[in-house]
Amino acid sequence: MAEPIALLAFWKNYDRRLYLRAAQLADELGYHSFWLPEAWGYEVFALLTEMAVHTKRIQLGTGIVNVYSRTPGLIAMSAATVDEISEGRFILGVGVSGKNVIEGFHGRPFEKPLSQVRDVVKVTRALLAGQKESEAGATLAQYRPFKLEMKPLRASVPIYVAALRQKAIEQIGECADGWIPTFWPYDKLAEGRAWIAAGAARAGRDASKIVTAPFTTALPLGGEGGTTMAKQIISFYIGGMGDYYIELLTRFGFGEDCKRIADLYADKATRAQAADAVTPGMIEALTIAGDPAHCIGELRRRRSFGVDLPILNLPTNMPWEMLEAFIRGMAPAT
């Protein structure tokens, strides 16, 4: 059996028709799943419904939907709906997003992120299982004894959580089915998996059944193309995506590099130089760059560090011909 590989559409400059075509090709080639992001453009459950109608086998995931802009009940309703239309192929990926998006775009207070994630997981599980919402064990609201006015296709859908901090990762062990880390050095995954195991032990769960599914930047481009793009992506996440990744990478020994990159990125006059400050060590730890054969071999090697399901970020701002070459080149071996 081929080792599972998934694909993730990039959230910036999103082209709906292009990614629908990509999902159809991934379905034909035997990819495990296709994940769609949600930022401040397209609404993700509607897009996944469209993909469900036009694909046959591939699983479809939210990568990720934030836990603030919809109520837990609405997330459960949406999950049940897409799961039915896809005939049981839906995966719910959730996370907290960030303060700028939640407060600045959605107008919701960015508060109690751990409790917010936990309530979404608990309410979704309860409602899909046919239970009353008041029985979910949620803590942020006093729910009345509502049940879904439909019978979900499955009594449970897989729930993956994007998280970078210890308490949030331990909570995955307590209640979720998968962990989605981003820009977590692959050779440090054991730390996060140990936190999952600690949470699972407290809840009496089997940690070995919890999937580690990192969003993975693979750049199978010849020459210096992959390295150049890797530098641009890393500098963007460090300089333009808040403190999450700086905090994470500083803990893993990249603090000075992150500060230098962030300082350059903060000034528009020097922003172009931020990519040049990305070191070879950061590229090696956070991405896979090189010719296709190297990327495939490296992806296989990194599974030994605890990667169960690599979710490959599809390159952005590329014509269909290049996107198709990526999908075919990185497809799971049959």
Q: For each predicted feature, which ranges?
A:
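N-terminal beta1-alpha1-beta2 module of alpha/beta enzyme domains
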Residues: 1-62, 157
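Hydrophobic faces of well-ordered beta-strands that scaffold small-molecule active sites
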Residues: 3-9, 34-36, 60-63, 90-94, ...
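An alpha-helical appendage that flanks or caps ligand/catalytic pockets
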Residues: 111-150, 194-304
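Acidic (Asp/Glu)-rich catalytic clusters
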Residues: 27, 48-59, 79-90, 173-174, ...
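Internal, glycine-rich beta/alpha segment that forms the wall or movable "lid"
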Residues: 3, 18, 76-178, 182-210, ...
